[in-house]
Amino acid sequence: MALLNVLIYPDERLKTVAEPVSVFDEELQTFIDNMFETMYHEEGIGLAATQVNVHKRIITIDIEGTKENQIVLINPKILESFGETGIEEGCLSLPGLRGFVPRKETVKVKAQNRQGEEFMLDADGLLAICIQHEIDHLNGIVFADHLSPLKRQRMKEKLLKLQKQIAKNR
């Protein structure tokens, strides 16, 4: 397995809308394994393929971080959503930054698993929030896009400053 490079906001490639997956081969299985490895290494609970510059509709999730309840959603679609909730969200593509994003409390998702078989998933709480966050990535949206223009600009400035510090220390 290999670690993948996570794109950092405001990288324009994060705005790319992902294409559906149609081939479920060994290469896809390896890529999904690498997504999980990257997600755990970066201490995240979810990762969308677009965040690692692969513009396919693939999401990996493990909200407990135990590796025992891994979820793979390929070509996910939210069919129903109910209730209102929201938390201060973070994101591997916006390291160290958080912002409140309103979300639906419960979602019903249709997706495919690693083998291409369709399934339905009812999710609520943190899992529902994570699914919505990652599907946003597949649609070229980062959580900062849900924030006010002023907050979004401040986030960009903080990240650019951080990137300059990292480059300076290399």
From Swiss-Prot:
Give the protein's cofactors.
Answer: Fe(2+)
Give the similarity note.
Answer: Belongs to the polypeptide deformylase family.
| Reaction it catalyzes | N-terminal N-formyl-L-methionyl-[peptide] + H2O = N-terminal L-methionyl-[peptide] + formate
User: A Gene Ontology MF term for this entry?
Assistant: peptide deformylase activity
Per the entry, the cofactor note is:
Binds 1 Fe(2+) ion.
Q: Which NCBIfam families match?
A: pept_deformyl (TIGR00079), PRK00150.1-3 (NF001159)
Q: Which SUPFAM superfamilies does its entry note?
A: Peptide deformylase
Q: What does this protein do?
A: Removes the formyl group from the N-terminal Met of newly synthesized proteins. Requires at least a dipeptide for an efficient rate of reaction. N-terminal L-methionine is a prerequisite for activity but the enzyme has broad specificity at other positions.
Name assigned to this protein: Peptide deformylase
Query: This protein's superkingdom?
Result: Bacteria
Write down the Pfam families for this protein, in alphabetical order.
Pep_deformylase
Q: Which InterPro entries match?
A: Peptide_deformylase (IPR023635), Peptide_deformylase_sf (IPR036821)
The UniProt record gives the binding positions of Fe cation as 91, 133, 137
EC numbers for this chain? 3.5.1.88
From the UniProt record, give one GO term of the biological process aspect: translation
Sorted alphabetically, the keyword list is: Hydrolase, Iron, Metal-binding, Protein biosynthesis
Write down the species.
Histophilus somni (strain 2336) (Haemophilus somnus)
Active site per the UniProt annotation:
134
